[in-house]
Design a protein with these regions (language model features):
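Short, compositionally biased "basic patch" segments
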Residues: 2-23, 124-143, 242-244
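N-terminal small/polar loop signature for handling phosphorylated ligands or for N-terminal nucleophile
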Residues: 47, 52-116, 163, 193-253
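An N-terminal, well-structured beta->alpha segment
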Residues: 1-70, 76-77, 154-175
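Catalytic-loop motifs flanking and including active-site residues across diverse enzymes
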Residues: 33, 37, 66, 88, ...
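Catalytic cores of large soluble enzymes that bind and process phosphate-bearing ligands
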Residues: 26-33, 58, 62, 66, ...
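Gly/Ser/Thr-enriched, mixed-charge loops and adjacent short helices
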Residues: 117-235
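Glycine-rich phosphate-binding loop of actin/hexokinase-like ATP-binding domains
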Residues: 105, 118-133, 248-270
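Well-ordered alpha-helical segments embedded in enzymatic catalytic cores
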Residues: 36-40, 91, 161-164, 224-227, ...
């Protein structure tokens, strides 16, 4: 405990959801919200013996402002922060697994509209959900926080991430693939990574733009795959892939333009 209880704002309980912390920027989510979430995550990570925390963000316009305060909160909690910058969520989880600690926070609005942002959190190797997320709110409400002087370092994790994937995957033949990143975070690495797997890549909306000007970044909805289907047919591609805003959801289209829905993808992966 410390003597700062009167400084901690009352955060909206509605943003502490089942699988993440998420809100509308400027309404239920502000820069100071990010700071205090950093303080709570830092305290919890330290309590579980993990002083090292990795932080990344997606390409949303509110990202730089929020991530700066998140990192400051973690450092003020006494954590050592590895800032991996703009990355897709899978790269953040990879970094949390291979760098010094097993904790990480991804600042992302995922597949939600542009004015949303949020926090996906892993502490000591466990992705937080349900009561674990509520425990962070309880820490803030009871002022159960740590205080320290942590340090921040910038880490370029993508080369190591690419090396791991390319080393693990060998394709039986060269494929022509249309890659629709939906102007999300996957645009910084998905085309290059898939190309490194010996594919011919046709990029579509791969410039990171937090306004998502071409279509909503949710490949789970058929209306967001219209451009991908058209490009696959136009180019005679073998396959089409579409990613959501932070690159942890994928939509798949066959060479004929048919959508492979998630239940069938699950059977293929099994």
């Amino acid at each position: 405990m410390n003597d700062m209880a009167h400084l901690i704002p009352a955060l909206p309980e509605s943003i502490f959801r089942a699988y993440d912390i998420r809100g509308v920027v400027g309404d239920t989510l502000h820069a100071e919200t990010a700071y205090w979430i950093g303080r709570a995550v830092g305290a919890q990570s330290l309590a579980q013996g993990e002083p090292n925390v990795v932080v990344g963000r997606d390409g949303r316009l509110s990202g730089p402002m929020l991530v700066a305060r998140l990192i400051q909160g973690l450092a003020d909690a006494g954590c050592q922060v590895s800032d991996v910058g703009l990355v897709p969520t899978p790269a953040l989880y990879f970094a949390a697994n291979v760098l010094a600690g097993k904790s990480g926070v991804m600042l992302t609005g995922s597949h939600n509209p542009p004015n949303y942002n949020g926090f996906k959190i892993v502490i000591a190797g466990d992705t937080l959900a349900n009561e674990q997320i509520q425990a962070l709110l309880t820490r803030l409400q009871t002022n159960d926080l740590s205080r320290g002087e942590g340090k921040v370092e910038k880490v370029d994790i993508l080369p190591r991430y690419h090396q791991q994937i390319v080393g693990d995957i060998k394709l039986a033949k060269r494929l022509k693939v249309v890659v629709d990143c939906g102007n999300g975070a996957a645009g910084i690495n998905a085309p290059q990574l898939i190309e490194a797997l010996n594919c011919e890549v046709i990029p579509l909306f791969c410039d990171v733009d937090g306004n998502f000007p071409n279509h909503h970044p949710d490949p789970g909805k058929p209306e967001n795959l219209v451009d991908l289907i058209a490009k696959v047919k136009e180019t005679g591609a073998d396959l089409g892939l579409a990613f959501d805003g932070d690159g942890d959801r994928v939509g798949v289209v066959t060479n004929t333009g048919s959508i492979v829905y998630p239940d069938r993808l699950l059977m293929l992966f099994a």
